Amino acid sequence: MGLSIPLIPGVLATALAAQGIRKRSLSPSGGLAAFIVGYLMMAVPFRGFGVSLIVFYLTGSKVTKVGKQIKGSLEEGHDENGYRSGWQVLCNSISAFIASCLWAAMFSPESIHSYLFGSFLPPHLSWHRANFSMDMTCPLNPHIGGGWSRTLVLIALGHFACCLGDTMASELGILSKSPPRLITTLARVPPGTNGGLSTSGTLASLAGGVIMGLTMFTSLMVESAGCRTDTGKHLASTVLAGALGGLGGSALDSILGATIQKTDFSNSTNRIITDETKTKPREVGEVKTISGLDLLSNNQVNLLSSMATGLALGWLA
């Protein structure tokens, strides 16, 4: 039994990272993080993890460019290209990254993940290690590996559903013609306020979750003969899980954003001051706080909400 190091995932990860740097959707550190995360996720024998990452990255990058001029007029420091650092890449991938690496380490003995992480698995996970056959069984089978295969797949799905749902809600919801309402008080707030809700943003978060659910379902149907024996059941479970992850994750992100993430507004420019604002507040003009305590940054809120959503769906598995 030898080590298997797939080359195609390396080529794809390199191409996506290079494209991101070239188009300025990724910083150099973001490109490096995207390559590492992308390669290890796409190298998992069950390609649903890697495909979900690609769909999230490409869809999220496209969405950030929608209405870029309008968003630039509403937010200080807005980057129309979505220039993501290595930290931002990790915040938007870490839960799914860990889940995918654990899945490969547990169920693919010849994978690079098994060689890198297999010896570090805790006893209760090592006990369920097995050589998984996509032709014979479905990764969503609750009886495989003590249920860990299904749990890890749904953690990854929940993570990406939350992240894409929140991305679509924040990037498209800000374009709503009616002002959003703060999730905690329902007071009207300026577009771009952390924790602000709008009808278009809520629908966008649902759409993002459904997209990720359909992505995972399609991967399961293409790869696993075991999953094709019960198509309707798996379609319902993945789309429902994606929808819950998109809506629930975005709602959790909004609650955290409205309470423990500070939102400041410049009266002189009539724009929200974001984490990326380079001009100091005293240079921007008179600033007022709209909501939230200055405890977490936007990236930290995204990290917490995506982790919680992924773990919740995994627990419900």
PLM features per residue range, with description:
Residues 1-317:
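Hydrophobic alpha-helical transmembrane segments
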